[in-house]
């Protein structure tokens, strides 16, 4: 009881001192008295009293902002030294209540929320952790370091992906502009002028900008994998591949380059896929994995690919991806790979044939006539090519896709011919009318 009474007496003395300093608007004195009270409670390991004093001091009339900020910052150092989870959660909630609605401790509130969300996640409460994180809009915090903002938003995205909330994950990911990762960190930062908002330095546990870039694209790969957006997955792996630390070590870039090759083949044929495919083929590192270089060359070359021989050759490599960086290529990857080979073969046939029987087309594609017609129809609907099927005669007619300028020029030319014809007809009619009128005169 003696120690307890001594502690209370010391706290009462410091509270009186704090009151005098606060009323005199002495920032340094108020801050010192408030932090000493918290330190006494911590040294005594009286966590209940610590929470009470934090709330009590923060609610004092005319309490100085600097004193509240110092109290919150000091109490945050005690969080990791709490004896159990319940005490830790109680202290974090107390500090959250104190910092609620106060712009001068918004960064501390964000860090506290992150700590609480981590505890909830460890307890298996993913949804609660995600909801907690989403309450904080760090993108509006002007004084928070850029890397800390990005790390916080990425944590929000990760928790949304963990709870299968892909819509919200996409919304949150759009708060990060990928160009921010390409900023030149080597440039000397300008010293802030007097009166400018000071940006706090990021804590030591926050990753660097390049590390955050990798985390960002790994999360985007998880998001795009949900809808099997192969071209976007490929672009994300390409961004990871371009990180200097990845390119320096073959153990890291070889698995990433393998993934780029696979997803390029899995992606539907379009201008972006074609551009990435040609750019990847020019990469010198591709010679280190010759099988994949040959695979890309097969896809680029306008020749019919035999599915069975291709699958037999690359089946083991396909299965090997499960044990490499990024994991398997997806549940539907095997089916989609076969579909892409069929689409490639149809494009090859359309290049060399103007007219072909459906039976011969099915033979070239190693499919039944019904399957060949189905895949051809799907490609026509997706506007990958232009074709017409004459079902009674069983003939497919391919047409060359015209550029929009060509179509416009053709239409303008036909319209000009039509107007010329109309004008000529008018002249002829007028001529005939004049001739007949002249003949009727006496």
From Swiss-Prot:
Disulfide topology: none
Subcellular location(s) per record: Cytoplasm; Nucleus
Gene Ontology, cellular component aspect: cytoplasm; nucleus; proteasome complex
Protein name, per record: 26S proteasome non-ATPase regulatory subunit 12 homolog A
Quaternary organization: Component of the 19S regulatory particle (RP/PA700) lid subcomplex of the 26S proteasome. The 26S proteasome is composed of a core protease (CP), known as the 20S proteasome, capped at one or both ends by the 19S regulatory particle (RP/PA700). The RP/PA700 complex is composed of at least 17 different subunits in two subcomplexes, the base and the lid, which form the portions proximal and distal to the 20S proteolytic core, respectively.
UniProt note: phenotype after gene disruption: Displays a host of morphogenetic defects, including abnormal embryogenesis, partially deetiolated development in the dark, a severely dwarfed phenotype when grown in the light, and infertility.
Residue ranges constituting the PCI domain according to the UniProt record: 232-403
Keyword Cytoplasm listed: yes
InterPro entries: PCI_dom, PSMD12-CSN4-like_N, PSMD12/CSN4, RPN5_C, WH-like_DNA-bd_sf, WH_DNA-bd_sf
Physiological role: Acts as a regulatory subunit of the 26 proteasome which is involved in the ATP-dependent degradation of ubiquitinated proteins. Required for gametogenesis and sporophyte development. Acts redundantly with RPN5B.
Keywords recorded for this protein, A-Z: Coiled coil, Cytoplasm, Nucleus, Proteasome
Originating species: Arabidopsis thaliana
